[in-house]
């Protein structure tokens, strides 16, 4: 299932995200195998997160988002050769923070946008009690502020998989 979800064009990205976030043991194994198809070595967090989240849409349920981000964080952390992060937990916390920043910066209903200083302050001591490098957080802030990560069912692709599409596979 993992390779099918990852490499089959035209599948409904909302359905993939919903499936990957499901709490059943089998679905969690598929999520791990799906996540293991990504190579994150040498990537900055936002680039890796963008490449991951372009293959499906995050479901709206908090527990499903948590499971998906936990799988991503573990894979991202395991693939890093730098010593920026002390644990996968630091990656996980920063992922949530980046998603909140993305929503804050790109949702027109948010009137007062988060500043760079607020983003850096919000992420104090998340790295095993230590701060992440200020430059790293600053680059993340500007990257997200300048270009949104597509989340929660937003899609530029209108082609969805339906029975008539199976012949094209």
Specify the residue positions occupied by each region the protein language model found:
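Catalytic and GAP-homology cores of small GTPase regulators
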Residues: 1-75, 83, 92-94, 101-169
């Amino acid at each position: 299932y993992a390779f099918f979800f990852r490499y089959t064009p035209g599948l409904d990205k909302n359905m993939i995200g919903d499936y990957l976030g499901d709490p059943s043991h089998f679905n969690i194994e598929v999520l791990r195998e799906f996540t293991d198809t990504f190579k994150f070595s040498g990537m900055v967090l936002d680039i890796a997160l963008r490449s991951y989240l372009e293959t499906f849409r995050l479901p709206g349920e908090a527990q499903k988002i948590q499971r998906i981000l936990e799988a991503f964080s573990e894979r991202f952390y395991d693939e890093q050769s730098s010593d920026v992060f002390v644990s996968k937990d630091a990656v996980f916390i920063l992922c949530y923070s980046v998603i909140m920043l993305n929503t804050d910066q790109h949702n027109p209903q948010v009137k007062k946008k988060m500043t760079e200083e607020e983003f850096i302050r919000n992420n104090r001591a998340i790295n095993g009690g230590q701060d992440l490098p200020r430059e790293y957080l600053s680059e993340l802030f500007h990257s997200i502020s300048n270009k949104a990560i597509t989340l929660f069912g937003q899609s530029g692709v209108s082609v969805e998989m339906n029975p008539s599409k199976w012949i094209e596979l």
